[in-house]
Amino acid sequence: MALRGTLRPLKVRRRREMLPQQVGFVCAVLALVCCASGLFGSLGHKTASASKRVLPDTWRNRKLMAPVNGTQTAKNCTDPAIHEFPTDLFSNKERQHGAVLLHILGALYMFYALAIVCDDFFVPSLEKICERLHLSEDVAGATFMAAGSSTPELFASVIGVFITHGDVGVGTIVGSAVFNILCIIGVCGLFAGQVVRLTWWAVCRDSVYYTISVIVLIVFIYDEQIVWWEGLVLIILYVFYILIMKYNVKMQAFFTVKQKSIANGNPVNSELEAGNDFYDGSYDDPSVPLLGQVKEKPQYGKNPVVMVDEIMSSSPPKFTFPEAGLRIMITNKFGPRTRLRMASRIIINERQRLINSANGVSSKPLQNGRHENIENGNVPVENPEDPQQNQEQQPPPQPPPPEPEPVEADFLSPFSVPEARGDKVKWVFTWPLIFLLCVTIPNCSKPRWEKFFMVTFITATLWIAVFSYIMVWLVTIIGYTLGIPDVIMGITFLAAGTSVPDCMASLIVARQGLGDMAVSNTIGSNVFDILVGLGVPWGLQTMVVNYGSTVKINSRGLVYSVVLLLGSVALTVLGIHLNKWRLDRKLGVYVLVLYAIFLCFSIMIEFNVFTFVNLPMCREDD
């Protein structure tokens, strides 16, 4: 999820400043997983022990996404993925006595390295590519910008298919998807500092397509194997999603134009019809509000663009005779020219009323002591023969809104030492990483390196692949040392580590008043994770590396997690709808509770608490 324009430098700078919060959150997730593994591990071991008598008939060796070679035999434990990586410098006993802390610090360092590469090098190069290809904002956001935020998950999935042959990659995809939907929305709702009005079209569009993608994924993994055409279908589905984003404006106009227009009485649908407690459909007829009840009107701030027709339809006042006359003259009983003039007059009056309300002025005193207001039906009449009176009746000119301060470009540099003491400590720890990246990757954000954006793209991609490999390696060692299965480490620790930077960026964007964009983009980026993050590795394995082969899937444990993912999407959209499409603290607490429930159920399923699902991981005394 990346933003263009002047907000991106501010977002990147703030993300660097929030490094302690990110590290603290990831460590808290790891501590929660360790406690849960100790709590549910014994229960799951008993369930697995009681099920050993049926293992030869019901169990195939747990090698998620591993190519079928016909030589697998039934075993009483699952081979750990740690053997697919280079040998660690420490033994298992040394790690259990404290050396694992070094691996945790290394994994956190890789999380930060991935965030730096994506924010300061990879995403700017993608923006330059989009500019050269003349892509629209929607298409660029659905393709290159989505790739910029989901590249760590994609490489984790590739490593899971071609190196570990385990479930750490798909666990990261599923866990990151749930984290993006629940945690990002929850954090924005709790800490945005304002109530964010969500656009129903963007949320419903991405949620419906994402639901379709998850259902297709469940159907494909149900038979415990992936063939070449199934990976191809996932990629084709993403191509269709790009087309939807390309024609997003036309589709939105088609689905929203269903309700009666104020101007001509033709069917037009307002976005406020779905999810607005003020709208009941009775105000489509201009004559209805004449005898209706005046509802409590929400307060509207002074915005650059005010949707006057939607505001009037959502909270119509009780009109008296002068305004009622204007409303009647915009019906189809009058000619088009009269309707246009009266509609323009209503819009001008309503705009003036909103400006006065925003400035705390609800009425204007006249010379004879009366007050002039739309609410009491006194519409001002201009007298061209008395310019002095017209000048006195005109409202004072409004001061122009202050222009936003320009955001200075904050280029990453190893030689800019911060002034604060805490920032200096962080600068010392991150200096080797920043120096290495600045020396090896040209920063195409700078004017002199702008023409080398393709070199930036290639080198940044290589560094992302290297950091992702080290990250998955360290997380695999941590999980093996603590006795946590790879899929749980992927769903929790890896998902949080790769998604917390995006969560912090979404919070920053929400505080800037763009919370709707942040929330809708989180769901849209999950479409990339499922369709591309899984479709591309599966397609490469079955069509390029080994044509005609299949990818083995442990659907017994994976289907449960994907069903939980599907349920979390449905419950989140339902909660947003019941909350009148508003993102506030109440909705934030609701989705965070859903995330905690998802983690608990996923961990209990993987530890065989409810029923036997997975074999325990093979342990070695080294």
Curated annotation (Swiss-Prot):
Record's compositionally biased regions (Low complexity): 380-393
Result of altering A146V: In AI2A5; autosomal recessive
One GO BP: response to melanocyte-stimulating hormone
Region (Disordered): 358-410
Pfam families in alphabetical order: Na_Ca_ex
Topological domain ranges for the Extracellular compartment: 39-97, 164-172, 222-224, 479, 548-557, 608-622
Subcellular location: Cell membrane; Cytoplasm
Signal peptide range: 1-38
Glycosylation sites: N69, N76
Disease link: Amelogenesis imperfecta, hypomaturation type, 2A5: A defect of enamel formation. The disorder involves both primary and secondary dentitions. The teeth have a shiny agar jelly appearance and the enamel is softer than normal. Brown pigment is present in middle layers of enamel.
Family stated for the protein in its record: Belongs to the Ca(2+):cation antiporter (CaCA) (TC 2.A.19) family. SLC24A subfamily.
NCBIfam families per UniProt: calcium/sodium antiporter
UniProt name for this protein: Sodium/potassium/calcium exchanger 4
